[in-house]
């Protein structure tokens, strides 16, 4: 499970308005969806947070996916006439059943792992 948080998203709403923030969320969601594989499931948790469920992920495949996901923010996103290049991602990763016994533990572990801005980290107990 990947827990994805948008860094500096509030700044988009504050500077350009909530319509721009909504448009940015849609664009980022589409980029994340395109970067994932067919069996993966992307969900918006709320606000500026997403989860990506990657069935059968290993530590190696999760790290490779995290690199791919971090890459979605390499190019600026154009909203109306504004180019937004300062929003980034923080990603926490937790593997089931290695790092959690149930869905709540898995989400908690991934959330705990994502606490470093601009990084993708695998949960370590």
Language model features with spans:
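A short pre-motif secondary-structure segment
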Residues: 41-44, 85
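Catalytic strand-loop-helix junctions within cyclic-nucleotide turnover domains
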Residues: 53-62, 80-84, 89-106
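Nucleotide-sugar donor-binding/catalytic module of glycosyltransferases
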Residues: 32, 39, 72, 98, ...
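Cofactor-binding loops of NAD(P)H-dependent oxidoreductases
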Residues: 4
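Conserved long alpha-helical elements within nucleotide-processing catalytic cores of c-di-GMP signaling
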Residues: 7-34, 43-47, 51-55, 59-67, ...
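Catalytic/regulatory signature loops of cyclic-dinucleotide turnover enzymes
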Residues: 74, 102-125
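Short catalytic/binding micro-motifs of nucleotide second-messenger systems
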Residues: 34-39, 71-83
